[in-house]
Amino acid sequence: MTKNNEAGWNLDHSYTTLPQSFYTEIPPTPVSSPELVKLNHSLAISLGFNPEELKKEAEIAIFAGNALPEGAHPLAQAYAGHQFGHFNMLGDGRALLIGEQMTPAGKRFDIQLKGSGPTPYSRRGDGRAALGPMLREYIISEAMYALDIPTTRSLAVVTTGEPTYRETKLPGAILTRVASSHIRVGTFQYAAARGSIEDLQSLADYTIKRHYPEIEDHENRYTALLQEVIKRQASLIAKWQLVGFIHGVMNTDNITISGETIDYGPCAFMDNYDQGTVFSSIDTQGRYAYGNQPYMAAWDLARLAESLIPILHEDEEEALKIAQDEISKFSVQYENQWFLGMKKKLGLFSNEEQDQSLIEQLLKMMEKFKADYTNTFRSLTLNTLENTPLFDSPEFKEWYKLWQSRLEKQDESKENAYEMMKNNNPSIIPRNHRVEEALEAAVTSGDYSVMEKLLEALANPYAYTTDQEEYCVPPAPTNRPYRTFCGT
């Protein structure tokens, strides 16, 4: 046990107030020679840590699972999940929650070690993680944070000095993940599947207290909980769609109750606009394709509603009706959020009847001409319509006239419209080929400079600076189709 607390550890463990069926207490498995390869300074400070102290050997031992900070209470969480539509009892198979850091601002964040060794939920897995996928999660989660999309974050990555065996021998690593909590739709499915209404109620009460305290005194608090989660997920999925983010594995165990994006295994950002885009090697049917994400979110939330039925109303028929009514509201909430976001991407302040068709026409043309999603909006923002099949087409020129005329009709100036576009159209995203380039250099050569440079550029996606331009270039046709793989 590490007693020295100059690093700033301030751990609580409220999750252990839940019935013990929700977790198993287990220590991390030590590793041979841990080395800190990445520390998130700004996140460390916001959590109340001293970054310089975190670089010391005693703290690196904590990130590796070789020691525990004062107040730690390591545990693996139990949950269930529909994985590609099939229900399984699951749990943290390679991660441990070591505690909840209480920040100087009075907020509570889970501190989880990912890749910390086997747990009772490992299901024949080795409980370990490889360096590449852990660095990938660090890069993408930080890019999402910079894009202002709710997300779990990465505090540190350490190498273990031990190999991890997947298809080949890979260097092992442990990621320290930070989240508002790790309560998932699958956590509620787990409680419901066990058949204890008391446990289900305990989980719902704990979740409300932790994430939605404003509804604690609500007359129908469990219905209100469902409403709040639906609202947050509608907003989250709209934000994904607006930047072209494809999660890749929207199983119910990867849908958080807090409304944060979690699990960056097979995710990627879309290059050419195509509703059918899939990157994940295991998503052979396209279940989680870009255009399907809103529908899959609604499906996942319906599983949450099902799990809550025993506590929504004492009459089962009435409870079922409440669940169905609430789930039916998701699509309208999502559409509203997405439409509002799309209007901002096109500099539209006011509401006009033609806006829907203006947006639809542009997306249809982008799909037809295989236009780069991010760069199309970037070019419209900068008003630099370089020679591309889309911009050279007569139909785009016609659309452009309509759009310009629509901008002129507004009370707001064109300058203000373009400024709003700039704040809503990222100049840079973590392009798949650039992320791979950074990972290749780090994993094979121990060269982290490529990753550092990429992270620096991704930190201000709406800045439109010249040093970002090299990262705006789409991949060469030879780099497509890009495939992602689950780290496990």
UniProtKB/Swiss-Prot annotation:
Cofactor: Mg(2+); Mn(2+)
GO MF annotations, alphabetized: AMPylase activity; ATP binding; magnesium ion binding
Residues holding Mg(2+): N254, D263
Signal peptide: none
Nucleotidyltransferase found in the keyword field: yes
Pfam families hit by this protein: SelO (PF02696)
Keywords for this protein: ATP-binding, Magnesium, Manganese, Metal-binding, Nucleotide-binding, Nucleotidyltransferase, Transferase
Binding residue positions for ATP: G91, G93, R94, K114, D126, G127, R177, R184, D263
Assigned EC number: 2.7.7.-, 2.7.7.108
InterPro entries given in the database record: SelO (IPR003846)
Active site: D253
Catalytic activity: L-seryl-[protein] + ATP = 3-O-(5'-adenylyl)-L-seryl-[protein] + diphosphate; L-threonyl-[protein] + ATP = 3-O-(5'-adenylyl)-L-threonyl-[protein] + diphosphate; L-tyrosyl-[protein] + ATP = O-(5'-adenylyl)-L-tyrosyl-[protein] + diphosphate; L-histidyl-[protein] + UTP = N(tele)-(5'-uridylyl)-L-histidyl-[protein] + diphosphate
Record keyword Transcription regulation present: no
Annotated NCBIfam families: PRK00029.1
Similarity annotation: Belongs to the SELO family.
Protein's job: Nucleotidyltransferase involved in the post-translational modification of proteins. It can catalyze the addition of adenosine monophosphate (AMP) or uridine monophosphate (UMP) to a protein, resulting in modifications known as AMPylation and UMPylation.
Stated name of the protein: Protein nucleotidyltransferase YdiU
Source species of the chain: Bacillus cereus (strain AH187)
Lineage, uppermost ranks: Bacteria, Bacillati, Bacillota, Bacilli, Bacillales
Gene name linked to the record: ydiU
